[in-house]
């Protein structure tokens, strides 16, 4: 029931089963990795320090989101874009078309799982290295820490716990976009500007003109709200 789900969110002793799902991750690495991502994505990648993360998106020319992701800068020239509801293979193949002469390699990061950890003291926006991957905190109604990890034993997922996890995303206003909804919603419609994931002053990127026009002139007719 909804009451049980809410109780699971706020009782510290209840946690989502360790292995949440296979993690869909696009890896961008190379000398030009940061510059390439900065030119393609609507978030300010140049402002992302090493071992930090931010929410980002890749827009089409009409300012509609192809995908929404968590971008981790795990090394100076290595980025991981975790797609909570997207296809890494699709996004990597599409991004590869824009590499041209950039010194960058775009690929699907294989073998990673998303794991729910005990809440940690990691500062918001920071990434901590772990023996099998990286961990960071996500916003929600209660503290929660996740780990992008290799070599995780698959576990049977509890439907109620997964529902609690999804509800936490909704309550935090995280607009994870399923691949079937790609290129249907503008950055403002998804609330990416509210999350600081759609920059107005970083320079040109696909869809930047639309993002700026909707911000300064208005005209956006959609917005994400939580109604219950």
Segments (PLM) and residue ranges:
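Basic, glycine/lysine-rich polyanion-binding surfaces/domains
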Residues: 1-228
């Amino acid at each position: 029931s909804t009451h049980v789900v809410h109780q699971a969110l706020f009782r510290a002793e209840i946690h989502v089963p360790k292995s949440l799902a296979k993690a869909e991750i696009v890896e961008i690495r190379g000398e030009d990795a940061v510059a390439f991502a900065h030119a393609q994505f609507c978030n300010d990648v140049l402002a992302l320090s090493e071992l930090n993360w931010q929410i980002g998106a890749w827009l089409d020319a009409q300012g509609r989101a192809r995908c929404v992701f968590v971008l981790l800068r795990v090394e100076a020239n290595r980025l991981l874009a975790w797609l909570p509801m997207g296809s890494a293979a699709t996004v990597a193949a599409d991004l590869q078309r824009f590499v041209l002469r950039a010194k960058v390699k775009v690929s699907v990061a294989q073998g990673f799982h998303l794991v729910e950890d005990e809440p940690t003291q990691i500062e918001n926006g920071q990434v901590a290295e772990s023996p099998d991957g990286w961990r960071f905190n996500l916003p929600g109604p209660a503290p929660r820490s996740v780990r992008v990890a290799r070599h995780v034993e698959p576990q049977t997922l509890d439907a109620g716990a997964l529902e609690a996890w999804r509800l936490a995303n909704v309550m935090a206003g995280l607009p994870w976009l399923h691949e079937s909804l790609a290129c249907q919603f503008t950055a403002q419609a998804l609330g990416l500007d509210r999350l600081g994931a759609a920059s107005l002053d970083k320079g040109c990127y696909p869809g930047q003109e639309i993002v700026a026009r909707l911000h300064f002139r208005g005209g956006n007719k959609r917005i994400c709200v939580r109604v219950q």
